[in-house]
A protein has these predicted regions:
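Preference for extracellular/luminal or secreted protein segments
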Residues: 1-15, 64-65, 244-314
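N-terminal hydrophobic targeting/anchoring segments and the immediately downstream early-domain regions
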Residues: 1-54, 60-65
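Divalent metal-dependent hydrolysis catalytic cores, especially in the metallo-beta-lactamase
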Residues: 18-24, 101-105, 257-261
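Second-shell residues forming the walls of enzyme active-site clefts
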Residues: 21, 29-42, 46, 128-285
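Glycine-rich, aromatic-flanked loop segments that form ligand/cofactor-binding clefts
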Residues: 42-70, 84-110, 130-154
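A charged helix-plus-loop insertion that forms the helical arch/lid used to bind
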Residues: 70-81, 124
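Active-site cleft segment of glycoside hydrolase catalytic domains centered on the general acid/base Glu
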Residues: 81-84, 114-134
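A non-catalytic, amphipathic alpha-helix used as a structural packing/dimerization or gating element
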Residues: 86, 90, 132, 136, ...
């Protein structure tokens, strides 16, 4: 959502075509208006007894959708674990007050200077230094009852352009990329409930050149297998130029092991929903993947409810 929900969007929520919402853009400058928007979508969802996931990019610094909430500091300026944890804990308190249950943070990418486009969004350029800071940020969020999301797996720190603008290939070797998985492993060990997949391609990890969020070797074999992540996997935005040439994106993402499909705009989201329904009707394998995803999402909802998150009152 880029602002208060439209009647058409609320109708889709009531029709159970939406599993969650993300607050995007700069339309959330009023805390009261943000809380009202969240209440309205939850009221629509609770007609069927199950609250929506409500997420926001609240990293700090330049990526801070809620200007009235912490963290004000960018990740690069959270130079100690105590500071990272305190900033995240303060953010969790503000998000909870607004009814927001998921922070799409921290960025676990290891910046590779001088050309990394991420700038101050990354905690730094040394995996051994970034890992404990990421873990501390995760602890700060989860201690406040907000689910943390490590992103953008398997790492965008060496990208020289944003995947929001065009397709990106990370041409680094396997040893280089593997060494920079330490912050993601730290996030998993610290209890991150979600991991967000990058839309870049990593030929050293998947020689087919398939974007990471569509890659079974990267999502299932590497993230779930090697790193042992059993939580919810969410895509980066699917309606970006980076994926414009990719066919059958929703079904391929689910087949790769993804649980949540994220879109920045309602039109592409509606189309993606229709495509996934079509694919599920045609494929028993997709239906099995969706059933496994539903179990992981149920576990996330249970974690949120146990930590004071949104519930639907009977």
């Amino acid at each position: 959502m880029w602002g208060p929900p439209t009647s058409a969007f609320l109708a889709r929520v009531r029709a159970q075509q939406v599993g969650g919402v993300i607050l995007l853009g700069n339309g959330w400058r009023s805390e009261a208006a943000t809380e009202a928007a969240v209440r309205s979508v939850q009221a629509a969802a609770c007609l069927h007894g199950l609250p929506l996931l409500v997420a926001v990019d609240q990293e700090g610094g330049t990526v801070r959708r809620l200007p009235w909430a912490e963290p004000a500091l960018a990740a690069a300026h959270m130079t100690t674990t105590a500071k990272a944890r305190a900033e995240a804990a303060a953010a969790a308190g503000a998000l909870r007050e607004a009814g927001i249950s998921v922070d799409l943070a921290p960025v676990a990418d290891v910046a590779t200077p001088p050309a990394s486009f991420e700038g101050t969004r990354s905690f730094g350029s040394d995996p051994a230094r970034v890992a404990p800071l990421v873990a501390a940020f995760v602890h700060g969020l989860t201690s406040g009852g907000v689910a943390a999301t490590a992103k953008h797996f398997p790492g965008l720190g060496s990208a020289t352009a944003s995947t929001d603008d065009r397709p990106v290939t990370i041409g680094r070797g396997k040893a280089f990329l593997t060494a920079r998985l330490a912050p993601f492993q730290a996030a998993v060990s610290a209890g991150a409930e979600l991991v967000m997949m990058a839309s870049a391609s990593y030929p050293a990890l998947d020689p087919s050149g398939t974007p990471a969020l569509l890659s079974h070797p990267i999502v299932t074999d590497l993230l779930r297998g090697t790193l042992g992540f059993g939580g919810v996997v969410v895509t980066d935005a699917l309606d970006t130029p980076a994926l414009r040439s990719q066919p059958d994106v929703p079904g391929r993402a689910v087949a790769a092991g993804v649980d949540l499909l994220l879109y920045a705009h309602e039109g592409p989201a509606e189309l993606g929903f229709s495509q996934l329904v079509r694919d599920a009707k045609a494929s028993a394998a997709i239906r099995a993947d969706l059933a496994a995803s539903a179990q992981r999402l149920d576990a996330l909802e249970a974690w949120l409810a146990a930590h004071g998150g949104p519930v639907c009152n009977p």
